[in-house]
Amino acid sequence: MAPKADPARRVVADNRKARFHYEITDTVEAGIALTGTEVKSLRGGKATIGEAYAGPSGDEFFLFNAYIPEYLEANRFNHETKRPRRLLLHRRQINKFLGATQREGYTVIPLKIYFNERGRAKVELGLGRGKKLHDKRETAKERDWQRDKARLMRDKG
């Protein structure tokens, strides 16, 4: 059975391929600076972060290429769907990400967008390095073996 979901943490968008394409070494929770129509649209649950990434712009970090659809009930005051969104991080976290991305070849990838128990929109960021093709094959083999092992244990037991 799947583990029970945390009722206080409602996931809006999930980047499921990130863990396949990247070796995630560290995760951090960050806030997102959003407009009112973006929050209302996120509550509808139609956001996409499959092609999104986080990067520096000046001395701040932004979430680029994240798609939040327009809010249908809004009129001319709607938001731009793929605009850069400022991430709310501590200075120490920003410096850590800057060092890792500039020197060590890491990438900052959004893993999830969710609402916390206080109703604030948060993004879970992962610091990761891209996997090579043979690493992806090993990951797929390991996943298949775990599935087969569980199936054998279930059928024998």
Curated annotation (Swiss-Prot):
Name of the protein: SsrA-binding protein
Signal peptide limits: none
Residue numbers spanned by region Disordered: 133-157
Gene: smpB
One GO CC term on file: cytosol
Function: Required for rescue of stalled ribosomes mediated by trans-translation. Binds to transfer-messenger RNA (tmRNA), required for stable association of tmRNA with ribosomes. tmRNA and SmpB together mimic tRNA shape, replacing the anticodon stem-loop with SmpB. tmRNA is encoded by the ssrA gene; the 2 termini fold to resemble tRNA(Ala) and it encodes a 'tag peptide', a short internal open reading frame. During trans-translation Ala-aminoacylated tmRNA acts like a tRNA, entering the A-site of stalled ribosomes, displacing the stalled mRNA.
Keywords per UniProt: Cytoplasm, RNA-binding
Family classification: Belongs to the SmpB family.
Gene Ontology molecular-function annotations: RNA binding
Organism per entry: Methylobacterium sp. (strain 4-46)
Domain of life the protein comes from: Bacteria
Stored Pfam families: SmpB
SUPFAM superfamilies membership: Small protein B (SmpB)
Annotated localization: Cytoplasm
Compositional bias ranges of the Basic and acidic residues kind: 135-157
InterPro entries in the record: SmpB, SsrA-bd_prot, SsrA-bd_prot_CS
GO terms for biological process, alphabetical: trans-translation
